Amino acid sequence: MLTAESRLLTLRRCRVTRQNQLALKSIVWILCLVPLVVLAYRAATGNLSANPISFLTNWLGQWTFRLLLATLALTPFRVLFGISWQISLRRLLGLFTFFYACLHFSVWILVDHFFNWDQMVVDIVKRRYITVGMLALALLVPLALTSTKGMVKRLGGVNWRRLHRLVFVIGMLAALHFLWLAKKGRTDQYLYAAILAMLLGIRVLDAVRRILRKRRQAHGAGMSALVRRSS
């Protein structure tokens, strides 16, 4: 039987072919649509709780944040386990995050407020959880619009990466949205915030590690050059 270490080594050496990549993305597509199918089934069977509007809004909002966390988890997964084939799923998960965020927003506009623009403006200004939620959605828009390979080439790799670092800000805004919105007695918002903090912490530690390694390499190269000159 394979040990956990040998299974990890196998995953690290695994090269995803084009066929396997398409199969993997197809599976992710299906999994990302499952929450929507479940929601449609519950709506069709009249099982949306005593407050259907609140249930719809919360369901779509929670899945938006879960998909955002899944997107943010791809790089930490590579850092921790040395596995990188899952990075190819980042664009797909990011677009599904935006898709669910738009559905969440649409329910708020169409069902909750029914195009009452004056009331929506008042809510955005007065209710801080709506304020940060709207800001998070606004920041998601440029990331979704620039997710194509053509936009990466047009913006340039460096500028594109700088723009897409907004996802970290979006994650923190989403966490605040849930923390400020949650009712007393609920704990899931703290779990989401803790997961986000852990994922961002792994990224920060990895960035520090890479900076220190580059400094050591530069110092080693400088010492080698000094020794050669002195000899």
Each language-model region and where it sits:
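Membrane-embedded alpha-helical bundles that constitute the cytochrome b-like, heme-associated redox core
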Residues: 2-231
